[in-house]
């Protein structure tokens, strides 16, 4: 019995070190551990991906490292390290709700249904759904995919929209973006639907970019936010204020230019409307 009690005590101690205590806030967890754990992508350039030097980089990661992490370190009065875990549309909410990560920082659209499970930061990027096709493919937009084989990511808003708007399309869902693009490259599907900026990233990083076309007008509104556990207002406020400060100071736009500017990884010019929208989210101090 004594040995069983010792084993139980050790097990509980291990569990306690892995998972936050009941009722512990994210700020309390980070203050104790000195680590912020984010969920992000490995194959969504330029938001989050592994580059040719095997470095895990991207716009979303930069926003965390350059804006949120310094604010967090100041708040908890200690140096905070960043730990990254891979996330995908089907896994990111479970990663948050199971306490495996503290923040989702990638290409996650803020939706009403997702708000039932997690909270979101302010919008930090705006895009919309389109199609990636091989050059010469007759698909020109949503109106031309009936009966066609279309790839999408599992758990994505893009897959839901295709099912709702064009139920006659033959939708094939894949676990992540690399798998969906591979299916397209191998001819298993005739188009891959995702947010336009992500498709531009795939095209830019493809071995032969000129073989691919981002087709059609935007057929959805995709406001990206950073997701976190519900009812953790202090942490959510810290993230929002850090993003507001980055927008107000111009640091956000410097990072945008680095990744999406004319000389960036994926040129994707920001419209004047989008810039004004971002700035309008900054509330007075």
Language-model features: where?
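Periplasmic-binding protein-like
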Residues: 42, 125-133, 196, 200-243, ...
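A ligand-binding cleft/hinge motif common to bilobed small-molecule-binding domains
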Residues: 91, 105-116, 161-164, 178, ...
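Extracytoplasmic small-molecule ligand-binding "clamshell" domains
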Residues: 23-104
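Acidic, polar ligand-binding/catalytic clefts
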Residues: 65, 77-144, 281-284
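Short beta-strand-to-loop elements that line the ligand-binding cleft
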Residues: 74-88, 152, 169-177, 216
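Beta->alpha turn/N-cap motifs
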Residues: 40-44, 85-90, 99-111, 135, ...
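Extended ligand-binding regions for polar small-molecule ligands
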Residues: 61-70, 143, 148-149, 154-156, ...
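Short loop->beta-strand "edge-of-pocket" segments that line small-molecule binding or catalytic clefts
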Residues: 35-42, 57, 142-155, 170
């Amino acid at each position: 019995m004594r040995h069983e009690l010792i084993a139980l005590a050790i097990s509980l101690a291990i569990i306690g070190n892995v998972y936050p205590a009941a009722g512990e806030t994210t700020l309390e967890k980070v203050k104790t551990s000195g680590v912020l754990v984010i969920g992000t992508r490995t194959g969504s350039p330029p938001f989050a991906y592994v580059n040719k030097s095997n470095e895990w980089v991207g716009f979303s990661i930069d926003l965390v490292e350059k804006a949120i992490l310094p604010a967090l370190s100041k708040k908890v009065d200690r140096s905070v390290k960043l730990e990254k875990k891979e996330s995908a549309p089907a896994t990111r909410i479970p990663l948050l709700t199971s306490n495996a990560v503290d923040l989702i920082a990638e290409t996650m659209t803020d939706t009403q249904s997702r708000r039932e499970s997690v909270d979101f930061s302010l919008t930090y990027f705006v895009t919309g759904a389109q199609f990636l096709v091989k050059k010469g493919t007759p698909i020109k937009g949503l109106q031309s995919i009936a009966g066609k084989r279309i790839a999408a990511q599992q758990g994505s808003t893009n897959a839901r929209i295709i099912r709702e708007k064009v139920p006659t399309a033959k939708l094939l869902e894949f676990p992540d973006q690399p798998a969906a693009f591979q299916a397209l490259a191998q001819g298993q599907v005739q188009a891959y639907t995702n947010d336009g900026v992500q498709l531009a990233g795939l095209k830019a990083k493809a071995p032969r970019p000129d073989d691919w076309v981002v087709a059609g007008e935007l057929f959805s509104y995709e406001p990206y936010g950073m997701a976190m556990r519900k009812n953790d207002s202090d942490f959510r406020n810290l993230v929002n204020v850090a993003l507001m400060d980055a927008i107000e100071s111009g640091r956000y736009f410097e990072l945008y230019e680095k990744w999406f500017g004319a000389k960036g990884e994926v040129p994707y010019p920001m419209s004047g409307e989008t810039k004004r929208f971002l700035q309008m989210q900054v509330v007075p101090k």
